[in-house]
Amino acid sequence: MDDFASLPLVIEPADLQARLSAPELILVDLTSAARYAEGHIPGARFVDPKRTQLGQPPAPGLQPPREQLESLFGELGHRPEAVYVVYDDEGGGWAGRFIWLLDVIGQQRYHYLNGGLTAWLAEDRPLSRELPAPAGGPVALSLHDEPTASRDYLLGRLGAADLAIWDARSPQEYRGEKVLAAKGGHIPGAVNFEWTAAMDPSRALRIRTDIAGRLEELGITPDKEIVTHCQTHHRSGLTYLIAKALGYPRVKGYAGSWGEWGNHPDTPVEL
């Protein structure tokens, strides 16, 4: 029986430690090269978070080309029957973005380690400095559009009653007081709930337990299509992950995010 079949999308350190030797597991570390070298969860393979992005201005958060993803997932030993567990050390931004990429490649079996390395260390669980054996060369992938909202898609949906735009940036960015593009402000109709507000620092950066109710208060509800973004779809990786974990049926990441929207001459903006 699949060791992971009974688990929810968001799992706890004890769940992972009990399954570290599962043959189907691909454990992905999205911390930093220095942090990984210092010690990582046993068996984890390091992925430089920047490899999950296109990396080209003005919208570095756009999806990398298929060839780059095929190389990346080949290095991880990707196979359809695999179960991914993903973690970072910042509360879930990079890990959530990686989960978005798993949706893009059509991988349906994955989990997020709640609180990531922070929660693992808080429980004094084991670390390793060993490097996993190389997994192989590039794999053939089919990419799916459904997890992603393009700029044109979002422009066509603005004002729809069944749309909620979740802006994961800071309130200062949302209000146009801190400007990181040609234009400041936010996408018309967007609701601001900063990604860090979804974390519980008293519980080692785990997702706060009252998050469903908080989103309900903001009108970010399961009956709507959720499109979430930040500046580069890094911070909004966490908010994408949270909506998925809550079972929201229609969730998209706007990969271009404010880097694209705020630098495009024809996009509407609210302050």
From Swiss-Prot:
GO MF entries: thiosulfate-cyanide sulfurtransferase activity
Entry's EC annotation: 2.8.1.1
One cellular-component annotation, GO: cytoplasm
Catalytic activity line of the entry: thiosulfate + hydrogen cyanide = thiocyanate + sulfite + 2 H(+)
UniProt key word Cytoplasm: yes
Keyword annotations from UniProtKB, A to Z: Cytoplasm, Repeat, Transferase
Domain of life according to the entry: Bacteria
Binding residues for substrate: 235
Stored Pfam families: Rhodanese
SUPFAM superfamilies cross-referenced by the UniProt entry: Rhodanese/Cell cycle control phosphatase (SSF52821)
Location relative to the cell: Cytoplasm
Residue span(s) of domain Rhodanese: 21-129, 159-270
Enzymatic class: transferase
Residues of the active site: 230
Domain comment quoted from the record: Contains two rhodanese domains with different primary structures but with near identical secondary structure conformations suggesting a common evolutionary origin. Only the C-terminal rhodanese domain contains the catalytic cysteine residue.
Record's protein name: Thiosulfate sulfurtransferase
Species for this entry: Azotobacter vinelandii
